[in-house]
């Protein structure tokens, strides 16, 4: 009886692996085609929101990446290198946790304030999303672009929630092609 239980658990583990593997392979294939927008929520940063007195120019006043968040960002960059996935440019929110995610994952990036969080003032979300879409519209449609942002921005663009360190891949009409989180 114990042997059967062990075999059953092993089979369940294997069965759980294949859908995740198939999703990863589909994501890689889609990204290699180009023309995708890769929306990445910043890596793990403990807490919610930012203190009332935070300053964009002072990381000590903001939520920052945890040690796991730093490792998560590095794994994200490794995923692109390992799978030979090209992208034209990385854009990041001006918040330190996003800039650090972009830096640890991809080294080079530019900040774009349209990607900044609107968590503290949701009334700003529509204006941020409009500005970001106008910015994206000017980019080469045949290339992949990476945007490291916050859940408010990703939800506003793709109408889907992203966990910390998760990628939401969309086409140029903001239709979600897939989501993926590097382990």
Segments predicted by a language model, with ranges:
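Positively charged n-region of N-terminal signal peptides that target proteins for export
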Residues: 1-6
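...with weaker cross-activation on analogous glycine-rich loops/strands in unrelated enzymes
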Residues: 135-137
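Short beta-strand segments
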Residues: 41, 147-149
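Hydrophobic beta-strand anchors of alpha/beta hydrolase catalytic cores
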Residues: 37, 145-146
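Short beta-strand-plus-loop segments that form exposed binding edges in beta-rich domains
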Residues: 152
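Active-site-proximal alpha-helix that buttresses catalytic centers in soluble enzyme cores
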Residues: 23-122, 130, 140, 155, ...
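Sec/Tat signal peptide C-region and signal peptidase I cleavage site
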Residues: 17-22
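Bacterial N-terminal signal peptides
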Residues: 9-16
